[in-house]
Amino acid sequence: MGVVHDVWLVTKELLEATALPWPSEEREERLAAVDRLLLEREELLRKLRPPYSEEEQELGREIIVWNQEIEARLLRVCEEIRRDLRMTGAKRQANARYVHPYEQPLSFDGMFYDKRR
């Protein structure tokens, strides 16, 4: 089976590595593992050459199904990271407003606005 079987094995490892949920404490290690597996699989995919036997075609179909699941899981992780970044930014702004309350006016109520200038 050769290269197709190797791609299948790496894809299976990748599927297991992307299993949800991803606790924020483990996120860095899991992202590093996923990145390593993706690079390994990319190298193997470059070595793929037809013709494929019936068994290799069956493995290929399974790889395609797994790949769709992996993509969906990675998109969810990406959304979690984006949400965490937004929350961190909001917390930082709220903390800055609390520490320095008069640096930026919160509202412009009662301020005179000259339309001509």
UniProtKB/Swiss-Prot annotation:
Biological role: May act as an export chaperone for the filament capping protein FliD.
One term under GO cellular component: cytosol
A biological process term (GO) from this entry: bacterial-type flagellum organization
Similarity comment text for this entry: Belongs to the bacillales FliT family.
Subunit structure: Homodimer.
Protein name as it appears in the record: Flagellar protein FliT
Location(s) in or outside the cell: Cytoplasm, Cytosol
Keywords annotated in UniProt: Bacterial flagellum biogenesis, Chaperone, Cytoplasm
